[in-house]
């Protein structure tokens, strides 16, 4: 990038606000939700036909919803970042707080609009996710319990956004939102020590939640339409990727170890979603979802995850 070009620097600053590696994980949420709904994507073995336009609308919607949420997070955090993270786009002056607020609001509105193109049910799910994102950014993230719960509900809602491609299947599969809720709750709770360090108690809580997620992924094998044999390799990959850094952070809750755990946890949302996708739609479809992992890793070399 040409650092002598102010317009390009400004564009780059707004891209940084979007946290592109994280947006890739949001796409994985929706793709997993589509698998849960049994939609007839190519290679998925799905039984419920869904228009490709609706699938594209839901994928675009999650980009808007997640992107809007993380941009507004920086807007609300601007005064704090001026002290703790002055290199971020807003406190450094590379992006204006007003411009970022407008950008984030437009992204959320676009996300809701995109979901509405799929179905009214999808639009309602998108409104829930958008409201949760704003609630988290403005208030909940400062609460030790409320913050992780709200963020987890947003992620769970994002999974259900994919399920809503078949509205009739949303209610019977709604409990699956507990998986991302628990895992993101683990990430969010431990992330509260990113700057000043955390506590072993928080680290142990995060490990307990991760253990519950792993156990639940295997317990889903009790469902007739969930093929545990297909999901198991992805569950193992998820465990290998996320457990070691969280154990290290729990043992020594220093800022750098917590940051490493959070980064690993965010990216591990992809193998988590791949496990769900493989269980409900077969290992080939699960592998397609997992293919987002190197994309997210590559983008994480260019953009911050947290």
Language-model-detected regions and their locations in the chain:
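Acidic (Asp/Glu-rich) catalytic motifs at the cytosolic membrane interface
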Residues: 61-92, 97-99, 186-200, 299-304
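Short, amphipathic, aromatic/basic-enriched membrane-interface segments that mark the entry/exit
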Residues: 16-21, 90-100, 117-122, 143-146, ...
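Membrane-embedded alpha-helical segments that form the functional core of polytopic membrane enzymes
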Residues: 26-76, 84-85, 108-116, 120-136, ...
């Amino acid at each position: 990038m040409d650092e002598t070009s102010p317009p390009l620097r400004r564009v780059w600053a707004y891209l940084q606000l979007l946290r592109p590696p994280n947006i890739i994980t949001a796409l994985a949420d929706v793709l997993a939700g589509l698998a849960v709904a049994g939609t007839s994507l190519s290679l998925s073995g799905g039984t419920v036909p869904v228009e490709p336009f609706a699938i594209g609308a839901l994928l675009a919607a999650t980009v808007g919803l997640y992107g809007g949420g993380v941009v507004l997070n920086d807007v609300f955090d601007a005064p704090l970042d001026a002290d703790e993270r002055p290199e971020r786009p807003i406190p450094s002056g590379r992006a204006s707080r007003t411009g970022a607020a407008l950008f984030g609001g437009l992204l959320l509105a676009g996300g809701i609009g995109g979901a509405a193109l799929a179905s009214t049910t999808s639009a309602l799910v998108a409104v829930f996710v958008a409201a949760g994102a704003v609630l988290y950014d403005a208030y909940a993230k400062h609460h030790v319990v409320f913050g992780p719960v709200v963020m987890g509900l947003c992620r769970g809602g994002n999974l259900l956004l994919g399920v809503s491609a078949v509205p009739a299947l949303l209610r019977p599969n709604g409990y699956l939102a507990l998986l991302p809720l628990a895992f993101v709750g683990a990430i969010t709770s431990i992330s509260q020590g990113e700057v000043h360090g955390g506590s072993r108690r928080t680290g142990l809580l995060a490990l307990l939640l991760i253990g519950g997620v792993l156990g639940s992924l295997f317990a889903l094998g009790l469902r007739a339409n969930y093929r545990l044999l297909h999901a198991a390799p992805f569950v193992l990959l998820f465990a290998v990727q996320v457990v070691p850094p969280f154990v290290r952070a729990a043992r020594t809750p220093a800022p750098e170890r917590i940051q490493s755990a959070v980064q690993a946890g965010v990216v591990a949302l992809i193998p988590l979603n791949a496990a769900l996708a493989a269980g409900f739609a077969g290992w080939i479809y699960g592998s397609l979802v997992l293919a987002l992992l190197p994309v997210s890793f590559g983008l994480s070399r260019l953009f911050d995850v947290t």
